[in-house]
Amino acid sequence: MAEISAKQVMELRKKSGAGIMDAKKALVASEGDMDKAMDYLREKGIAKAAKKSDRIAAEGLTDIVVKGNTAAIVELNSETDFVAASDPFKAVLKDVANLIVDNKPADVEAALELKTANGTLNDDLIATTQKTGEKVSLRRFTIVEKNDNENFGAYLHQGGRIAALTVVEGADEATAKDVAMHVAAVNPEFLDRSEVSDERLEHERGIFKEETLNEGKPANIVDKIVEGRLNKFLSQICLADQDFVKDPDLTVEKYVDSKDGKLKSFIRYEVGEGIEKKQTNLAEEIKEQLNK
C-alpha cells in the first residue's frame, strides 16, 4: 500500500472540500493517485468536479491590450501582492502587453528577446526586479486575432487578478464585454459542447453512473439519471450553455443571439493558476489527525 503523506491529504482536501479522513481514505483506495482519488470522492458523492482554479498561489497581475484586429492577454508574476500593486510593476506590465501585441512573438522565450529602449524585454524585467527587490517574470501570454465583422470583449477583475478576452461575431463590443465579464466570474472550460472530447464525456458518464448506483437508484432508471446529470454538468462547464450572470433566464449563447451575434472564442487568465506555494498552516493539524 502506498504511503499517504499529510501534504497529499491537504491538497486533496483543498481541491475537493472533503473531510480529512474521507480524503485519506480516497488516497489509500487510489494508491496515492490524486486524480483517481478525486474521482473516488465524486463517485461517493463527497466531492464535485474540481474547477481549473483550485490550485492558485502565485502573485502578479494580468493585462489585456487591444489594437485593431489583434489583442494580447498577458500574465506577469511577482513574489508578493505588494509589489504587484506597485507603480513600477504596473508600468512594466503595460509595456510588456503593448510590446507583445505589436510584435506577436511565438512564445515567452521569443518575447524576452524583443528589443526595447533599454536593450531587451528581459533586460527591462531584470531592471524591474532590481527596483522592486523581487523577481519579476513573464509567465505567459496569448495573442488573439479577429476579423473585421467581429468584436473583442476585454475585462479585468480585481485590478487584473483575473482577465478575460472574448471574440463575438456580429454583436457589438458591449456584448462581447458582457460575455468577458461572465467568463471572468464563472470560469467555463469550453466554448460549447463540440469542444468536449469523447474521452472526457465517457469519463464523466462513468463517474455519474457509479454515483447513481451508490445511491441505490432502480437499475431501470440509472441510465436516464446519468444522462440528466451529464447534461447538467455540460451546461456548467460550457460557456454557450451557462446561465448568463446578468440575466439567468438566458444562456450565454441565447444572450449573444439576442444581440444578433455568435460566440467565437474566449480565454481567461487567473494570476498564478496551476502554481503552488509552500503551505504549512494546515499540515500539522492533518498530521495529528492522521496519526490518531
Curated annotation (Swiss-Prot):
Compartments where located: Cytoplasm
Keyword Protein biosynthesis included in the entry's annotation: yes
Annotated Pfam families: EF_TS
SUPFAM superfamilies the UniProt entry points to: Elongation factor Ts (EF-Ts), dimerisation domain (SSF54713), UBA-like (SSF46934)
PROSITE patterns to which the protein is assigned, alphabetical: EF_TS_1, EF_TS_2
UniProt-listed CDD domains: UBA_EF-Ts
InterPro entries noted in UniProt: EF-Ts_dimer_sf, Transl_elong_EFTs/EF1B, Transl_elong_EFTs/EF1B_dimer, Transl_elong_Ts_CS, UBA-like_sf
GO MF term set: translation elongation factor activity
Keyword annotations of the record: Cytoplasm, Elongation factor, Protein biosynthesis
UniProt region (Involved in Mg(2+) ion dislocation from EF-Tu), positions on chain: 80-83
Record's GO cellular component terms: cytoplasm
Top-level lineage group: Bacteria
NCBIfam families, per database record: tsf (TIGR00116)
Function: Associates with the EF-Tu.GDP complex and induces the exchange of GDP to GTP. It remains bound to the aminoacyl-tRNA.EF-Tu.GTP complex up to the GTP hydrolysis stage on the ribosome.
Family listed: Belongs to the EF-Ts family.
Name this polypeptide is given: Elongation factor Ts
Protein source organism: Limosilactobacillus fermentum (strain NBRC 3956 / LMG 18251) (Lactobacillus fermentum)
